[in-house]
Amino acid sequence: MEAVLLLAKLPEAFSVFSPIVDVMPVIPLFFLALAFVWQAAVGFK
């Protein structure tokens, strides 16, 4: 029973990280953009 109560309180505990979780799907797009910027910097060799 205590484990169930602990699991019920987990979403409240992690509510602080919700902005980070909202941004996470966009992170691979930043890496893709970084690859293009890097290739533009080296002249697309």
Curated annotation (Swiss-Prot):
Pfam families: PsbK
Topology term for the membrane: Single-pass membrane protein
Protein name (database record): Photosystem II reaction center protein K
Oligomeric form and interacting partners: PSII is composed of 1 copy each of membrane proteins PsbA, PsbB, PsbC, PsbD, PsbE, PsbF, PsbH, PsbI, PsbJ, PsbK, PsbL, PsbM, PsbT, PsbX, PsbY, PsbZ, Psb30/Ycf12, peripheral proteins PsbO, CyanoQ (PsbQ), PsbU, PsbV and a large number of cofactors. It forms dimeric complexes.
Cellular component GO terms, alphabetical: photosystem II reaction center; plasma membrane-derived thylakoid membrane
Keyword set, alphabetical order: Membrane, Photosynthesis, Photosystem II, Reaction center, Thylakoid, Transmembrane, Transmembrane helix
Function: One of the components of the core complex of photosystem II (PSII). PSII is a light-driven water:plastoquinone oxidoreductase that uses light energy to abstract electrons from H(2)O, generating O(2) and a proton gradient subsequently used for ATP formation. It consists of a core antenna complex that captures photons, and an electron transfer chain that converts photonic excitation into a charge separation.
Residues of the propeptide: 1-8
Chief location: membrane
GO biological process entries: photosynthesis
Transmembrane segments: 24-44
Location in or out of the cell: Cellular thylakoid membrane
Organism from which the protein derives: Acaryochloris marina (strain MBIC 11017)
